[in-house]
Amino acid sequence: MPRPGKDSYDEQKPPYSYIWLTYMAIQDSDDKMLPLTEIYKYIMDRFPFYRKNTQRWQNSLRHNLSFNDCFIKIPRRADRPGKGSYWAVHPNASGMFENGSCLRRRKRFRARGGQDDDDDDFHHPAPSKISRKNPLPLLPEPPITPPLLSSLFPNLPPSLPNFCLFPPGMDPTKSLLLNPLSLLLMPHFLKNSSNFESSTPHSETSEISGSGSSSSKTPTPEAGFNSSFSIESILSS
């Protein structure tokens, strides 16, 4: 079937997108700008296909016109009666319509440095790949080991990091994950470092490995802290 000529589409749908139809209507006008009603009239006068189902295609054209940056809206002057603003082609969008060819689909013009999108009858902005509801995953916190604890608090007694992280009876190959808030108590440990040092058994390593006697004494919280340690002392510090 031969392809219809430029002005002989009759009832067939012309191979132009709504963006190209709008461009042709504006460029054929004397002032290079038209109100929306005149754009509709131009299309219906030139292409009989658009004389039916006018509400459907006019809504689609208006949607594309509003969201495509290659067209700019110009307020109607006071000396020109009528309703609605005028539409014109953006000065920087002339490259989209080079050679006067409106048959080919070209990339959508973005006036503010955005990415180009393909021109379709309906244009919907692409959703953001990074959503506030789906933030980037947080990196896992590293386990706190005795060397790390000693480096953070160099004034701690030598036996305190091992005792805090590996209580008697616990497998020394498995490190504990301390709550960061628990490190706030370290200054209170330092106040009683002498009492804690004296109450910590020297055979601590043997107790951890399980080779020590069951009668070995395990240091208790009361032995490591004096009676002045309380919740009030934490809050007042």
UniProtKB/Swiss-Prot annotation:
The record's region (Disordered) falls at 110-141, 195-237
- Gene3D superfamilies, per this entry? Winged helix-like DNA-binding domain superfamily/Winged helix DNA-binding domain
**Feature: compositional bias, Low complexity:** 206-216, 227-237
Q: What does this protein do?
A: Lin-31 regulates how vulval precursor cells choose their fate. It helps specify three alternative cell fates in vulval development.
Where it sits in the cell: the answer is: Nucleus
Q: Name one GO molecular function term.
A: DNA-binding transcription factor activity, RNA polymerase II-specific
Protein's UniProt name: Protein lin-31
Q: Does the keyword field hold Thylakoid?
A: no
Pfam families registered for this protein in UniProt? Forkhead
Instruction: Kindly state which keywords UniProt assigns to this record, in alphabetical order.
Output: Developmental protein, DNA-binding, Nucleus, Transcription, Transcription regulation
- DNA-binding region, as residue ranges, is located at 12-103
Q: Can you cite an annotated GO cellular component?
A: nucleus
Q: Which GO terms describe its biological process?
A: anatomical structure morphogenesis; cell differentiation; regulation of transcription by RNA polymerase II; vulval development
Q: What is its main location?
A: nucleus
